[in-house]
Amino acid sequence: MQLQIERGNSMKLDEDKLSTAIKSREISRVNYLYGEERFLVKTYTDRLLDATVGKDRNDINLIKLAGTFPVDTLTDSIDSMPLFADSKAVLISDLDLEKFDDNGIETILNSLKDVPDECTVIILSLIHI
């Protein structure tokens, strides 16, 4: 159900391992959640967001991006410090890398390689890329 990328290393977690990681707050900096079951993807997205930015989902520390977006928006969102909190999350829905040029793709991938400890990136897809 989920692929986590931690500083260039990847591991695939099933629901039990993901649930354990969330409970123990051992969440990777970059998380790719995918699946055909919309309910499960949403449930685990909500649990990751609860663990990183809290249940109130303060918009200051939750940055939402969808589809295509200015690459600078992603890099700035990842690099900026959380406000009035210890952590923040960047939620990317329906990322379509084919809509970006080569420089944009390279910038996105480089940004995901070096996510600061106070930031969690969650990439959502209803299908596995």
Label each region the model flagged.
Residues 16-22:
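Pre-Walker A adenine-sensing motif
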Residues 2-16, 28-31, 38-42, 47-127:
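Non-catalytic interfacial helical region
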Residues 24-26:
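Short, flexible turn/loop "capping" segments at secondary-structure junctions
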